[in-house]
C-alpha cells in the first residue's frame, strides 16, 4: 500500500517518521486513546477502515483489536491544521485501552 501523495505532502512527521493519532468514539464523543501512526498505518486505515497504528516499542504496525478483539471501525479521518495530528472517529468494540477500560483516560482525574 502507498499513501496518496497529496495526503503524504500535508503530513508533518517527527524525526522517526511518525505523527500522532487521536481516537474519538463516534456518538459519545469520548476521546478513547492517543497513538502513533506512520504513512503505511494511515494508508492501511484509509483503505480498510480498520484502525492501524505504529508501535514504537515493537517497531511495527498493529491493527487495533487483531489479538484482543477490541476493534475500531473507522468512520472518518481528519488532519489538524498543523498536519502533525490526525483525528480518527471510530466505532469501538470492547475497551479501547490495553487495560480493558473503555478509554485510556478512565484513570486518575488530575483536576
Curated annotation (Swiss-Prot):
> What processes does the entry annotate via GO biological process terms?
L-histidine biosynthetic process
So what EC number does this one have? 3.5.4.19
What keywords sit in the KW lines? Amino-acid biosynthesis, Cytoplasm, Histidine biosynthesis, Hydrolase, Magnesium, Metal-binding, Zinc
Task: Cite the InterPro entries for this sequence.
Answer: PRA-CH (IPR026660), PRib_AMP_CycHydrolase_dom (IPR002496), PRib_AMP_CycHydrolase_sf (IPR038019)
Principal localization?
cytoplasm
Q: In which pathway does it act?
A: Amino-acid biosynthesis; L-histidine biosynthesis; L-histidine from 5-phospho-alpha-D-ribose 1-diphosphate: step 3/9
MF-aspect GO terms: magnesium ion binding; phosphoribosyl-AMP cyclohydrolase activity; zinc ion binding
Q: How is the cofactor bound?
A: Binds 1 Mg(2+) ion per subunit.
List, alphabetically, the Gene3D superfamilies matched: Phosphoribosyl-AMP cyclohydrolase
Q: Where found?
A: Cytoplasm
Catalytic reactions of this protein: 1-(5-phospho-beta-D-ribosyl)-5'-AMP + H2O = 1-(5-phospho-beta-D-ribosyl)-5-[(5-phospho-beta-D-ribosylamino)methylideneamino]imidazole-4-carboxamide
Asked whether the UniProt record includes Zinc among its keywords, one would answer yes
Per the record, its GO cellular-component terms are: cytoplasm
Q: Look up keyword Magnesium and say if it applies.
A: yes
The similarity comment for this entry is: Belongs to the PRA-CH family.
| Function text | Catalyzes the hydrolysis of the adenine ring of phosphoribosyl-AMP.
Q: What is this protein called?
A: Phosphoribosyl-AMP cyclohydrolase
Amino acid at each position: 500500500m502507498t499513501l496518496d501523495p497529496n495526503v503524504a505532502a500535508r503530513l508533518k512527521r517527527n524525526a522517526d517518521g511518525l505523527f500522532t493519532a487521536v481516537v474519538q468514539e463516534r456518538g459519545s464523543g469520548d476521546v478513547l486513546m492517543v497513538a502513533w501512526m506512520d504513512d503505511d498505518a494511515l494508508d492501511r486505515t484509509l483503505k480498510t477502515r480498520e484502525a492501524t497504528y505504529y508501535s514504537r516499542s515493537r517497531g511495527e504496525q498493529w491493527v487495533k483489536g487483531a489479538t484482543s478483539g477490541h476493534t475500531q471501525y473507522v468512520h472518518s479521518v481528519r488532519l489538524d491544521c498543523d498536519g502533525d495530528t490526525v483525528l480518527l472517529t471510530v466505532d469501538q468494540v470492547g475497551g479501547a485501552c490495553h487495560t480493558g477500560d473503555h478509554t485510556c483516560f478512565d484513570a486518575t482525574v488530575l483536576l
